[in-house]
Design a protein with these regions (language model features):
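Acidic/proline-rich low-complexity IDRs
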Residues: 9-10, 63, 120
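Low-complexity, Gly/Pro-rich coil/beta segments used as flexible assembly/activation regions
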Residues: 41-42, 46-110, 114, 131-146
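Weak global preference for isoleucine
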Residues: 3-7, 19, 78, 109, ...
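Residue-level detector of alpha-helical recognition elements and their boundaries
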Residues: 22, 28, 59-62, 66, ...
Length: 146
């Protein structure tokens, strides 16, 4: 075997090693982003659950609840994530519906979770839910939910 073919094989193997290192590195980054994305989605879902509880925690009000905040409320208790939760009446600002002697109002709660750790890419997930709250005028004791 000549020296030229030996150098060629050495360079070929070095290039293959560099390509393999790049593939392994990118797959590790992708796996880490998948984990961060899953955690961000769970944080957003926790924000939605918090928002649902804020609407009517005990069902002890005889009147329909209102949104807890139309401007985003930022939750700081979920570590490594900034979760902002917003409530809006759906589809309009004060729309209520009457159905069979019951009064209904629909709310949309949106929670957005963003990873706060410094990363080259921003990881962000959003969860959204629409919920109907109902009051029945014939119910005279709490809980007043229909």
């Amino acid at each position: 075997m000549s020296i030229i073919s030996a150098i060629f094989l050495l360079l070929l193997f070095a290039a293959l090693a560099a390509i393999m290192a790049q593939v392994v590195s990118s797959s590790n980054t992708t796996a880490a982003q998948d984990v961060q994305g899953s955690r961000a989605l769970q944080a957003a879902q926790a924000g939605v659950e918090w928002g649902l509880f804020q609407l009517d925690p005990n069902g002890d009000s005889a009147t329909l609840p209102s949104c807890f905040a139309t401007n985003p409320t930022v939750l700081t208790t979920i570590s490594d994530y900034q979760v902002s939760v917003r409530c809006t009446p759906y589809p309009g600002a004060t729309t209520t519906y009457a159905e069979g002697g019951k009064t209904l109002r629909v709310f949309e709660i949106t929670a957005t979770a963003r990873a706060t750790a410094s990363q080259p890419l921003t990881i962000e997930r959003e969860a959204r839910v629409r919920v109907e709250k109902c009051r029945d005028s014939t119910i005279t004791v709490a809980p007043f939910d229909c």
